[in-house]
Design a protein with these regions (language model features):
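Conserved phosphate- and dinucleotide-binding cores of soluble alpha/beta proteins
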Residues: 1, 97-99, 108-115, 121-123, ...
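Electropositive, gly/pro-rich neighborhoods at or near active sites that engage anionic ligands
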Residues: 1-100
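General "foldedness" signal
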Residues: 48, 52, 62, 66, ...
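Adenine nucleotide phosphate-binding catalytic loops in nucleotide-utilizing enzymes
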Residues: 104
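Glycine-rich beta-strand-to-loop/alpha-helix junction loops that act as flexible
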Residues: 131-134
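Extended, charge-enriched "interface" segments that sit outside catalytic cores
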Residues: 196
């Protein structure tokens, strides 16, 4: 959402800032905390996203992928002396900041419903853009919602995959565009991409 705002550059930078250090907020993005606070105040994730969009002066609209609270679980290698050992890490921040290499992710709970309006937005779109963003914690989770994956598979819209300019340690370090597609196929084999940027 913060990436959509041109007029409010300083706010955009603030929303994208991740806290450093080792405290309770370490690794958390300011924007996610603001969104969570607004969600608690309004009781509605869509209303909270609309409020964040208004704060940032965004012209478009962002919808949550699901109306239920979700967590991310990742299969990670490279955390033990034996590189074949796979450990499960749970939580967006833990996955995004792991010193290991993420191999696969899943949602908790699995098979959540899509949020109101998301499937309709995909069905009526001319172009659907996947990314940019944290590959395993922002992009892939969207295709793990069954209704969204089905909508992305059937839509006649052009599907554009936008890769990050720089790799993310633990998530996409050393990934080629082909590896990104391979991981997408592992998680959502029914989705074809038309363009990669």
């Amino acid at each position: 959402l913060a990436g959509e705002s041109e007029e409010h550059q300083r706010l955009t930078e603030l929303f994208q800032h991740r806290y450093g250090g080792t405290g309770a907020l370490a690794g958390h993005a300011v924007g996610n905390l603001v969104f969570t606070g607004l969600w608690e105040l309004t009781g509605d994730p869509i209303e909270a996203l609309d409020a964040v969009g208004s704060i940032l002066g965004v012209a478009g609209r962002v919808l949550p992928m699901s109306p239920v609270a979700l967590d991310i679980a990742a299969e990670v290698v490279g955390l033990e002396s034996d590189p074949r050992v796979v450990r499960t890490i749970i939580g967006q921040v833990a996955v995004a900041t792991t010193p290991g290499s993420v191999r696969r992710v899943r949602l908790i709970p699995e098979d959540p419903p899509a949020a109101a309006g998301v499937v309709e937005a995909v069905d009526s779109a001319d172009v659907v853009v996947l990314g940019p963003g944290s590959w395993f914690t922002s992009v892939i989770p969207n295709v793990l919602v069954p209704e969204i994956a089905a909508a992305l598979a059937r839509t006649p819209a052009t599907k554009v995959l936008v890769l990050n300019l720089a790799p993310q340690p633990g998530e996409t370090a050393g990934f080629s565009s082909e590896q990104h597609l391979h991981v997408l196929r592992q998680h959502a084999p029914q989705i074809d991409v038309d363009v990669i940027l």
